[in-house]
Swiss-Prot record:
EC number, UniProt record: 2.1.1.-
Similarity field: Belongs to the CFA/CMAS family.
Keyword S-adenosyl-L-methionine: yes
Function: Probable N-methyltransferase not involved in benzylisoquinoline metabolism. Shows no detectable activity with (s)-coclaurine, (R)- or (S)-reticuline, papaverine or (R,S)-tetrahydropapaverine.
Name assigned to this protein: N-methyltransferase 4
Organ and tissue specificity: Expressed in stems, roots, flower buds and leaves.
Length: 356
């Protein structure tokens, strides 16, 4: 590769024209994440801790969330038909759990829901809130398995809410409702509280974790309630997913600037003013990498169907083509990121909290 083509602008120009093949794209992405590791790791343990503490403290001076509107438009309001052409049968957009190597993507979706329910200690008869519920895979799984429970999904995507309510009708479920709202602004009427609150790969869009957890804790029942959080993390350092330098073509291309933060695996331990940690687990990043690999395979197989849905939804073939290129880059980027060091750099953290 000619060195001049490494400049971010040149790479983006070639990418949007469809001039970069899969293997070259993967290598270009790998270079960006190597740079991110170089920036994240510090020379000594003392420097590493000092950097992490400075980051944690900086979050407490920020507003509650990142750019929710931008990320919602780019990721969560795409036509359902286009999304369905890529994901598994329950349209799970967060990491699946490949408990067995031989599992299909559909089986790994269910395995992830089962693991979430086990670690969140979901039981029949509870009231459950799923914040950032996506297309409702976990909501519908819980509602069908725990028939005496009531499950509330909260999403800021009208497309997602409409899809979930269609499934609720098809399945004749009477124990589900879905709220269309921005979690940072929403308040429940009559001070409604829940036995379990689930936040699965949604806290990445928050900045001021202290404010967020304080707000969520007010929705927890005073007795025997738990908050279960799943978030993508780095094992050692926290980092906003923002451009690192002028050659960083990748970061703001795949996600809106300022919309995502990758906390370290231990970062939430510093935010126990309103909740306290009961347990914590760490999953290999390979589960996310494998999920993205499977989605990318389906994306390529169903590209024609996805493109048709995008063309209808976005109004032009050119717009659909650009989203397809962006999606390809997104999938490949996550595969590269969560495969680093055999899945032991960027990983998946699970936390169980109780209300203080």
């Amino acid at each position: 590769m000619d060195s001049k083509d490494q400049h971010g602008t040149k790479i983006l120009e070639r990418l949007v024209k469809g001039e970069i093949g899969d293997e070259e794209l993967k290598e270009l992405i790998r270079i960006r994440f190597e740079k991110r590791l170089q920036c994240g790791y510090k020379p000594t343990p003392q420097d590493q801790l000092a950097s992490e503490m400075a980051f944690i403290k900086s979050l407490k001076d920020m507003k509650m969330s990142g750019e929710l509107e931008a990320v919602n438009t780019e990721l969560y309001e795409l036509p359902t038909a286009a999304v369905a052409a890529t994901l598994g049968s329950t349209l799970k957009q967060s990491a699946c759990y490949f408990k067995e190597e031989s599992m299909s993507i559909d089986e790994a979706e269910i395995a992830a829901y089962e693991l979430d329910c086990e670690r969140a200690q979901i039981k029949d008869g509870q009231t459950i809130l799923d914040i950032g519920c996506g297309f409702g895979g976990l909501v519908l799984h819980i509602a069908q398995k725990y028939k005496n429970s009531h499950v509330t999904g909260l999403t800021n995507s009208a497309e997602q809410r409409n899809y979930i309510m269609l499934q609720v009708e098809k399945l004749s479920l009477s124990n589900v409702d879905v709220i269309l709202a921005d979690v940072t602004k929403h308040e429940f009427e009559n001070e409604k509280k829940f036995d379990r609150i689930l936040v699965v790969e949604a806290i990445e869009h928050m900045k001021n974790i202290q404010l967020f957890l304080k707000k969520i804790s007010n929705w927890m029942k005073d007795e025997d309630s738990f908050l279960f959080v799943v978030h993508l993390c780095h094992k050692a350092f926290s980092q906003h997913f923002e451009a690192l330098d002028e050659d960083d073509w990748y970061t703001s291309y795949v996600l809106p600037e300022g919309s995502v933060t990758y906390l370290s695996a231990s970062a939430l331990l510093y935010f126990q003013d309103d909740v306290s940690v009961v347990d914590q687990w760490l999953l290999s990043g390979t589960h996310m990498a494998r999920s993205q690999e499977e989605w990318f395979k389906r994306f390529k197989i169903n590209l024609e169907a996805a493109s048709k849905a995008l063309t209808v939804g976005l109004g032009s073939e050119e717009a659909a083509n650009q989203v397809n290129i962006q999606y390809k880059t997104f999938f490949m980027g996550y595969v590269v990121q969560f495969s680093f060091n055999n899945g032991e750099e960027w990983m998946i953290s699970h936390y169980l909290f109780k209300k203080k």
